[in-house]
């Protein structure tokens, strides 16, 4: 008898254990609309579940109540759409000062490319679209195509 990789094994009378549900661990709580040391404000309310690191230069902010997502600063929407992978439904705002902000995994968005948005205006709703592990906002700040640490702008 041999068992090959990928082969399904059926055990009569066997029981499949349910996978444990792992609660999201909030590293820190933040409040939408609170201004950081630069012009950017926090884009939503919730708990930080992932800080920026070399392989993930973004903030992940989770909140099971699916709160609104706000423009971190004024600017022009350069992209608003949905992908079946990666960022899922997302919005990119060009702030006209060399910076862009990206808001990903939205359940819905309320802006279109070309729209002008004011700081703090609602651009969407937190979701779990694309390649996502649960309800959260993936928030990036970019300059010249380079991802920057959002905390440098929000602290």
List PLM regions with ranges.
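Acidic, glycine-anchored pre-beta loop/turn
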Residues: 1, 109-121, 145
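Short acidic, glycine/serine/threonine-rich helix-capping segments at coil-helix boundaries
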Residues: 1-3, 130
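Surface-exposed, glycine-biased beta-strand/turn segments
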Residues: 4-88, 119, 148
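Conserved positions in beta-strands of structured domains
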Residues: 49, 76-78, 107, 124-127
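Zn2+-dependent peptidoglycan hydrolase active-site motif and core
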Residues: 72-110, 135-140
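Active-site-proximal beta-strands of protease catalytic cores
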Residues: 75, 114-129
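Short, exposed beta-strand-loop hairpins at the edges of beta-sheets
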Residues: 128, 138-144
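Short, low-complexity, Pro/Ser/Thr/Gly-rich segments in the mature regions of secreted, periplasmic
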Residues: 143-155
């Amino acid at each position: 008898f041999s068992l090959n990789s990928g082969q399904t094994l059926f055990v009569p009378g066997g029981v499949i254990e349910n996978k444990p549900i792992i609660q999201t661990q909030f590293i820190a709580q933040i409040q939408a609309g609170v201004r950081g040391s630069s012009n950017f404000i926090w884009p939503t309310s919730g708990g930080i579940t992932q800080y920026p690191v070399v392989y993930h230069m973004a903030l992940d902010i989770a909140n099971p109540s699916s709160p609104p997502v706000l423009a971190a600063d004024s600017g022009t929407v350069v992209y608003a759409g949905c992908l079946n992978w990666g960022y899922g439904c997302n919005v990119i705002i060009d702030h006209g000062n060399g910076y862009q902000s990206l808001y990903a995994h939205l359940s819905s968005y309320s802006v279109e490319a070309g729209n002008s948005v004011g700081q703090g205006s609602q651009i969407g709703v937190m979701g779990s679209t694309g390649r996502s592990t649960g309800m959260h906002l993936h928030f990036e700040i970019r300059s010249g195509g380079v991802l920057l640490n959002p905390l440098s702008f929000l602290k």
